[in-house]
Amino acid sequence: MGLPWYRVHTVVLNDPGRLLAVHIMHTALVSGWAGSMALYELAVFDPSDPVLDPMWRQGMFVIPFMTRLGITDSWGGWSISGGTVTNPGIWSYEGVAATHIVFSGLCFLAAIWHWVYWDLEIFSDERTGKPSLDLPKIFGIHLFLAGVACFGFGAFHVTGLYGPGIWVSDPYGLTGKVQAVNPAWGAEGFDPFVPGGIASHHIAAGTLGILAGLFHLSVRPPQRLYKGLRMGNIETVLSSSIAAVFFAAFVVAGTMWYGSATTPIELFGPTRYQWDQGYFQQEIYRRVSNGLAENLSLSEAWSKIPEKLAFYDYIGNNPAKGGLFRAGSMDNGDGIAVGWLGHPVFRDKEGRELFVRRMPTFFETFPVVLVDEEGIVRADVPFRRAESKYSVEQVGVTVEFYGGELNGVNYSDPATVKKYARRSQLGEIFELDRATLKSDGVFRSSPRGWFTFGHATFALLFFFGHIWHGARTLFRDVFAGIDPDLDAQVEFGTFQKVGDPTTKKQAV
């Protein structure tokens, strides 16, 4: 049978045994990829600096997903939080990778078995002897089992009743750790940033799934609905399954890009909106103001800012700064962060404090403009020096550092002041090592960006797949020219439309 490449799946259309076999093989491939990718990432991951070189800076993709579900330790003796461990047990990064690979192998063998032994009694209709599946019943079974898994995850794993809990952090991604979460049953459970909503929603959705599954197992669909929605056709299952998958893909693309309790910034990096809104900058200034109110000096107040918080307030960690086709981790772009130089405070010769206007997300270059606290431009780095009025040299701008490695250091020579003014456009200033990885200095996106792009793209493609297969199954008789309710034996070639006596062909 010479099938074109896009029609090859028709070989399992009326063969339930081999349809099952190819799905088991698909599960083997997915699980095998996950385990293999985890082992590869563990081979290249450097856990030595969780503050300035976290997993998302190194381009880790599957390690964050394991971590948010409660895996924190490695057989290599390290912990994701930076400490050391002596007995991580089976539920370590390597243990999870190994279980996926073992499961993949078992699925591989099961797929071969079902491909060879395809003609099982369970797949044949005892009345007709032909292969058939009771699709509404199978739907009920799967819905029930999915409900049990969903309920179990929310009630046991997330709550810590029987499981580790999940990764929970503060709003600024500083204190994250794996902990048990109590379900949030009030209105706060609908806040996407409240971890308790994860537990309560899984419990509620799981309960609904169990009840719906039992309903579909005990109640048969009405005949008119069964025929109208083509419930006996396997392509109906394909179409509705694709719908479920593309809907889920759109949802997770949104929760990843805009941020939520399920995508902590410690594991996936900050969102672009935190840069756009000056989210971390405002928190840093709030902490400094509180320090000054407690009679700390400016230097002492800035020195109390956690390096982790300062690092979030750097444009190189904005996932929207990386081009879609720039391969590699963030570390391959601007380099590996080594240390925070400190916060630069600029002043003109009249003693006014000046603030460098920060670069918006979608700019690659941006004019260096320094404004005072009222937003009035007081200094800049001009494009044309001949017409400049506010140049650093003319205004006499100086810079002094507070906190970080350059704490207490000040510069007045224009070249150095301009250098740090340019770097201040990008947020807090860090020393970056570009030599180790031969980093090219061009920003890369974080796994947050890749995940969003991949899932949004595939969701769109799968949406079209849903429309395609849904139309094929609903209008199959129209496309084929055969009435599905036609019981009479028909002769191909007698009529222009098969089985329709009103279209009898004329003898030539």
UniProtKB/Swiss-Prot annotation:
Q: Which Gene3D superfamilies match?
A: Photosystem II CP47 reaction center protein
In the record, what terms sit under GO molecular function?
A: chlorophyll binding; electron transporter, transferring electrons within the cyclic electron transport pathway of photosynthesis activity
Output the Pfam families linked to this UniProt entry: PSII (PF00421)
A Gene Ontology biological process term: photosynthetic electron transport in photosystem II
Stated membrane topology is: Multi-pass membrane protein
Q: Where are the transmembrane segments?
A: 21-36, 101-115, 140-156, 203-218, 237-252, 457-472
Query: What job does this protein perform?
Result: One of the components of the core complex of photosystem II (PSII). It binds chlorophyll and helps catalyze the primary light-induced photochemical processes of PSII. PSII is a light-driven water:plastoquinone oxidoreductase, using light energy to abstract electrons from H(2)O, generating O(2) and a proton gradient subsequently used for ATP formation.
Family of this protein? Belongs to the PsbB/PsbC family. PsbB subfamily.
User: What protein name is recorded for this chain?
Assistant: Photosystem II CP47 reaction center protein
